[in-house]
Amino acid sequence: MKSNLSTKNSIYNYNNSNNSISDSSSNVLANFDFSEIDAKDPSLSEGHKLIYNREVPFELRLEDNDGPQEVASFEAIRCKILIGGEENNPIQIRLELSCENDLFFHFTSDIDEEAYKVMQENQKLTVNFSEFCNLLKRLFNNCINEPQSYISVFIMQKEGTGRLDFIQNIEYKFIELLSIDFVNSPDDTVRKQIGYRYNALRTKMEMMQDRIMTINNIIKIKNPSLIHQINKAPYKFNMYAKSNNSSMMK
């Protein structure tokens, strides 16, 4: 599997530009309890337990058997690791990939101990199946935290399959660490995921709006002059922006 320096730098720049946004979003949402919403995730419907859920910078490629790979694009892909059984002794490991910018992008990989033995033999992996979850977490986190050294490349086939390659850059030499095969999720699964994501987002927005209204009402009672200043602030900002724009055009 080949990659290049432009790929490395593009992912690095993409990751850095989104860190501040994701961090601030996490801080805002940290005070809300979304456990009831999260429990309705269709990914959990078969009894799996979610142990990892983060957005990871991916290089996406579409491979055509009749021609060369199309030019790569870069996306933040939601990566979920789910397990059947206990985390230190799983019966099955399921990986799910989804994308906020493409609601129909949804791929799944189910790996049990027998399937892992084949992977282990073919790719000369040294970790046991019980340690595979920790390896996956570490690789995903490395791609987030060290994008100049670790790259996740997802290659999609037109027949609906995909392959995720984890690549490490060591002094301009690219080493393939792990490859995992995926399949496009069934239409019914995709529909359920889209419905859940829409409803979850709407419910979270309603919760945040209710919180803002509650805070607003408290301020009205405790400090009416402050709420008056807050309401005037957008008007002052707009007037300031218009004034600046006018002076720049002269």
Task: Enumerate the predicted regions with their spans.
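N-terminal, leucine/charged-rich tether regions that mediate assembly and partner docking
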Residues: K2-I144
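Sequence-level detector for tyrosine residue identity
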Residues: Y12-Y14, Y52, Y116, Y150, ...
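Short amphipathic alpha-helical segments embedded in low-complexity Lys/Glu-rich regions
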Residues: S98, I111-E114, V153, N216, ...
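Functionally constrained cores in energy, signaling, and assembly domains
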Residues: H106, Q168, K222
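A short, charged
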Residues: T126-P147, A200-I219
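Extended assembly-interface/linker segments at domain junctions
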Residues: E131-K192
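Intrinsically disordered, low-complexity acidic regions
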Residues: I175-K250
